[in-house]
Amino acid sequence: MTDFPPSTRRRFLASSLAGAGALAGLSSFPSAFAADGRKTDTLRLTWGFTGLTFIAKERGELEKTLAKDGIKVEWIGPFPNHAPTLQAVTGGTADVSFGGSTTPALAAIIAGSPLVFTQFLVYDPRTTSIIAKPDSGIRTVKDLVGKSVAVNRSGLGEFLLVAALEKHGIDRSKVNVVYLNPPDAAPALASGKVDAWSMWSPGVDIARVEHNATDVFLEGRDLDFQIDFTSYLTRRRFAEDNPSLIRAFNAALKIEADWATANTKEAEHIAQAKAGYRDEVRDHLISLKRRYTLYPVTDQSFVTELQKATEWLVARKVLPEAVTVADHLARV
């Protein structure tokens, strides 16, 4: 596992700062917030082919809700996973990340990105899984020894692999960890360039249908604790300048979460129409009856749990150094 040397952190910032508005995002923060106001009526939201934000985008109601407050939504994307959206937000080409793993968000903050959490999301059941094709010879976690496993760096995939190996007493050095983003990992698994893949829905669900992949370690079944959560982030300066806008977005997304929880079948049909996966995948996702629960950054109990999770990740070098979550919360 990589220990994220300072040069890596500089590269992250260099790529992020290429976007417009980066200098404003990194300038000194004002001592007083733009009380109850906002300096823009436009909110640029990132999106990808998964998750609550994707469903909200395709449903089209979130824009209508925010329009009642005079807020115009612009969609930036698609993005393959959370980390690139964090770079877009850091660089100023987008305003809010699309709701992804807290782990790359924490890694970006450690690397120096001026990001703050605006809210958190927990979905249930947890469906992230380490999967392998039938011809891989992998049936159990112990079979991963000497094999290659694709994961997204400092993300949900890497966390699950680390947790699975630890639970079964396997040293990480005995597994060949291959860092790939989802668009590259899926064909790598299909072609046999990697032996297994640690991934979330719908990627794992598609692989089960198209390649007869099976679960080696399923988060909701095989792990009795949760370390990684879903999170939304913006630039610290943007939150300070636009507290009412962030509050309005949080409230609008709560409406979407409640709707998606109560209307699983319709939500999954909406997602499939854009993502284009098979009906078998859609029907499996419908059967999960996924529930979405949002937590505000003012929820001290949740923040405490996230801090414990952060320390777990630091101890296992998934994150390179300690970070205090409470120092990186939007004050809106």
Predicted regions and their residues:
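Cleavable N-terminal signal peptides
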Residues: 21, 32-33
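Pocket-lining segment of extracytoplasmic ligand-binding domains
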Residues: 103, 183-273
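N-terminal secretory signal peptides
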Residues: 1-7, 11, 16-23
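Conserved C-terminal helix/tail region of periplasmic/extracytoplasmic solute-binding proteins
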Residues: 310-332
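Secondary-structure end/capping motifs
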Residues: 240-318
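Short, solvent-exposed loop/beta-turn-alpha elements that line the ligand-binding surface or hinge
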Residues: 63-71, 221-224, 293-302
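Periplasmic-binding protein-like
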Residues: 121-132, 213-238, 291, 326-332
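Short, glycine-/small- and polar/acidic-enriched structural segments
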Residues: 35-170, 176-179, 195-201, 226
